[in-house]
């Protein structure tokens, strides 16, 4: 029963793009940044689907994460591999995005969450 309720709550966070917000869009959460898609939250959500054997939702989420975020912004990862540590905030792979995988407008911050990128790559490579 608890697992089913948890899955229902997770489904409320699902975006039409297949990505997952940190909280449901209609949750009334006061802190608006939690209404965004975070790489880390999406990966942990996908790992939850894997743990209950929901391969369809797992597959859809993996494709969304790859297509909408990681491949879309891969040039930033490529740049980092070749050039090293970014000099400007905009050069980092950001930790959060809009529901469609685009950047949050006006947010040129470089909050590094390399662990989230590493977690995503680890999970995708399993």
Tell me what each language-model feature is.
Residues 1-126:
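Acidic, mature catalytic/reactive cores of soluble proteins
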